């Protein structure tokens, strides 16, 4: 007869809650992605001229949604594990968006660029670790 393991039960329940929350989040993000696609198409075919910053910001927000959805897909495909490099990709993309949208203060822009450099170095180190495993 199997004994009841409370630790395993709690972990299983929490894993189910996390999975359901991530599925709901992926549905919401997919809706936002579709909305961003429609907005992007409207920018392209609109007679009104939008600034290139607005268009580039729209594209980067689109990729942020896309990266978060890809991260959730990877979570389920890799046995409930979030790979570090996907978070780094999202961080780099978000910082690039910040530089494009908010570039009035040179010192802030320099700090964002430095943060991107740190993330790229972290990505390189992470990838080197993965290459050594192979």
Swiss-Prot record:
Name by which UniProt lists this protein: Protein PsiE homolog
GO biological process, one term: cellular response to phosphate starvation
Subcellular locations according to the entry: Cell membrane
GO cellular component: plasma membrane
Native organism: Bacillus anthracis
A Pfam short name: PsiE
Coiled-coil boundaries: none
TM ranges: 14-34, 56-76, 82-102, 106-126
Family: Belongs to the PsiE family.
């Amino acid at each position: 007869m199997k004994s009841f393991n409370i630790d395993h039960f709690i972990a299983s329940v929490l894993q189910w809650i996390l999975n359901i929350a991530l599925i709901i989040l992926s549905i919401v993000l997919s809706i936002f992605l579709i909305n961003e696609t429609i907005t992007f198409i409207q920018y392209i075919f609109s007679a009104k001229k939008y600034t290139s910053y607005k268009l580039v910001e729209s594209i980067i927000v689109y990729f942020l949604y896309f990266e978060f959805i890809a991260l959730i897909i990877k979570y389920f495909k890799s046995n409930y594990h979030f790979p570090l490099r996907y978070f780094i990709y999202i961080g780099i993309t978000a910082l690039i968006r910040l530089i494009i949208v908010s570039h009035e203060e040179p010192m802030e822009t320099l700090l964002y660029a430095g943060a991107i450099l740190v993330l790229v170095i972290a990505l390189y180190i992470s990838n080197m670790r993965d290459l050594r495993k192979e």
